[in-house]
């Protein structure tokens, strides 16, 4: 089964409780505390699932394979292929928030594949839970997505994932997860594969291990496979592919890890190694019956950025991996695991076009590379357009916003300037309202900081890719200008004190700066050059000690997402393991002015 839910509706927590209830957790896993599945540092920090995880739980005499899918639309590439491995889905919906855009996205994919459905209303212990309304929302959503009668009559459970309880009646609190396990077994049919037929397996996911190389993961449709057996790799979309190889290792999925095994049979979800060139969508077959299995084509990327070698004056001082070859190798390695990502060489040898499913998709990759010791610079994100019948089409987003009523006007004004069209508005109780918009994807670049300011941190924004539409015209993404350093050196209090009167600072005393580096922003919308390395000329009567009396306003450091949102079209982001620095593409002031005058 696959568990689908919106970001932060509690699916990883619920799966953890299911593993504990299955009582087959390894001793060393008990000590980690929580979130066994989110085993990537970034996932634990952000509370989101990026990669699909596979685990299994033994209940009675059944082995239930559970796949935890990402709820964020940017990782939709993961979701689509994972659904090929399952017989049914458990739809998890927050009892207060109800159905959100990403729930719709993944559920639509599941219904298209005619999978059995079980619905769980989670977090029923929330004080603002509205269980009856959420049940209606789920049924309306299913009807809207064209669910079959069987799918509309799916069982509904009421859960508290944190406590590990489930109940069939919202008024009767549950004591354990047995009702959930029993419902899953009675609703979702076991795999129908034939163990006697020739071996056939679809590769739905790949991993990489330094010791055994490429690892393929998938479900066996038919037959049995043993370690050392010869197989043929073929592909539904590439009829010419016929590649022979041997399975050197086989792994079975247990409570929270892979266990080596000698043979596997139809219906099992397994991992294997020994085929270095196998990729997602390939079929492994017995040499006696080479027949590829159909595979869903992944949606195209919608956003691109340019990753290039860091060429700033501070380049090479903080990172371990700084050359174009090292960056290229790392991006190629990411392609082995991430099907929604595309990488192409650009016009220059030291930069690469990296395309993904959204800003978050690419920012997770940048943050991961940064933590691994890579140093690089990236361009502002751009949308990927299509030309159809001579017209330019751009990606659109369906945006759902929950805000307190008093900030509704500010949000509607801000999004209206970004070409958003209001499609629906509904009241959520006495003091909150839900707004639904359709707008160009690029209109959301740089909007989150403005949204947090407009709603005083009380708004919730969610988005989902919503097809393509005709180019909507110019959108001004940023209203502020940049404070640009025109000296290279170390920022000092005296220089910063003078600069802060021109705008808001992003660097503090003692930080290294260079010519062309953005050290803050102005409210005017125009770039202003400042010298933050300027020291006071000392005389007998002007001592340096009086600098201590200068008061600097505390600075706010931007996160990686904040930096990407902040970038203007003529700026780049320098990413190192220790620092994030925003800079102009042309560092020299005179050359920058000449380039600007040519554009006019």
Residue ranges, per PLM feature:
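P-loop NTPase switch module centered on the Walker A-proximal segment
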Residues: 1-93, 97, 137, 206-209
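Interdomain boundary/hinge elements
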Residues: 31-33, 145-157, 191-202, 239-253, ...
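Canonical P-loop GTPase G-domain recognition
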Residues: 116, 126-186
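Short glycine/threonine-rich beta-strand-turn micro-motifs
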Residues: 160, 346-361
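Conserved nucleotide-binding/hydrolysis modules and their immediate coupling elements
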Residues: 200-305, 315-317, 480, 489-539, ...
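Helix N-cap motif at beta-to-alpha junctions
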Residues: 224, 276-277, 356-362, 404-408, ...
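Long insertion/accessory domains within large nucleic-acid-processing enzymes
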Residues: 253-261, 393, 439, 449-568, ...
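A short, contiguous, amphipathic alpha-helix enriched in charged residues
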Residues: 312-335, 549, 553
């Amino acid at each position: 089964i696959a568990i689908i839910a919106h970001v932060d509706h509690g699916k990883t927590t619920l799966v953890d409780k299911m593993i504990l209830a299955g009582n087959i957790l390894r001793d060393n896993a008990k000590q980690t505390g929580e979130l066994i599945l989110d085993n990537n540092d970034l996932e634990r920090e952000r509370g989101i699932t990026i990669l699909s995880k596979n685990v299994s739980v033994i209940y009675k005499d059944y082995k239930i394979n559970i796949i935890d899918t990402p709820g964020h639309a940017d990782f939709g590439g993961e979701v689509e292929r994972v659904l090929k491995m399952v017989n049914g889905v458990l739809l998890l919906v927050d009892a207060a928030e109800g159905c959100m855009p990403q729930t719709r996205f993944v559920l639509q994919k599941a219904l298209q594949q005619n999978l059995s459905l079980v619905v769980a209303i989670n977090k029923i212990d929330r004080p603002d839970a509205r269980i009856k309304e959420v049940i209606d929302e789920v049924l309306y959503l299913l009807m809207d997505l064209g669910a079959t009668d069987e799918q509309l009559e799916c069982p509904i459970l009421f859960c508290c994932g944190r406590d590990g309880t489930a109940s069939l009646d919202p008024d009767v609190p549950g004591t354990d997860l047995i009702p959930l396990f029993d419902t899953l077994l009675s609703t979702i049919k076991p795999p129908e594969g034939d163990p006697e037929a020739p071996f056939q397996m679809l590769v739905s996911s790949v991993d990489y291990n330094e010791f055994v190389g490429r690892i393929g993961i998938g479900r066996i449709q038919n037959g049995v496979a043993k370690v050392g057996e010869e197989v043929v790799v073929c592909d539904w979309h590439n009829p010419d592919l016929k590649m022979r190889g041997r399975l050197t290792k086989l792994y079975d999925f247990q409570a929270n890890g892979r266990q080596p095994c000698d043979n596997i049979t139809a219906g099992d979800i397994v991992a294997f190694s020994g085929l270095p060139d196998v990729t997602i969508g390939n079929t492994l077959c017995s040499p006696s019956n080479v027949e590829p299995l159909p595979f869903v084509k992944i949606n195209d990327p919608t956003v691109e950025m340019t990753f290039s070698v860091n060429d700033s004056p501070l380049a090479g001082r903080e990172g371990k991996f700084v050359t174009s070859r090292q960056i290229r190798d790392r991006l190629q390695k990411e392609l082995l695991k991430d099907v929604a990502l595309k990488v192409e060489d650009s016009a220059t040898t030291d930069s690469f076009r990296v395309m993904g499913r959204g800003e978050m998709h690419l920012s997770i990759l940048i943050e991961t590379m940064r933590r691994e010791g890579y140093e690089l610079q990236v361009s502002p994100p751009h949308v990927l357009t299509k030309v159809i019948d001579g017209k330019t089409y751009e990606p659109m987003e369906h945006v759902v916003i929950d805000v307190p009523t008093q900030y509704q006007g500010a949000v509607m004004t801000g999004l209206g300037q970004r070409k958003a069209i209001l499609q629906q508005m509904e009241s959520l109780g006495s003091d909150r309202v839900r707004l639904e918009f359709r707008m160009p994807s690029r209109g959301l670049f740089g909007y989150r900081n403005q949204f947090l300011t407009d709603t005083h941190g009380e708004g919730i924004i969610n988005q989902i890719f919503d097809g393509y539409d005709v180019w909507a015209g110019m959108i001004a993404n940023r209203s502020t200008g940049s404070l640009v350093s025109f000296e290279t050196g170390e920022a000092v209090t005296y220089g910063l004190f003078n600069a802060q009167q021109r705008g808001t600072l992003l660097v503090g005393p003692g930080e290294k700066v260079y010519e062309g580096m953005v050290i803050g922003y102005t409210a005017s919308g125009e770039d202003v050059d400042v010298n933050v390395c300027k020291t006071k000329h000392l005389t007998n009567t002007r001592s340096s000690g009086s600098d201590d009396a200068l008061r600097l306003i505390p600075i706010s450091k931007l996160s990686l997402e904040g930096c990407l949102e902040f970038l203007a079209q003529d700026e780049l982001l320098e990413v190192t393991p220790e620092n994030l620095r925003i800079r102009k593409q042309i560092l020299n002031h005179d050359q920058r002015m000449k380039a600007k005058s040519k554009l006019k």
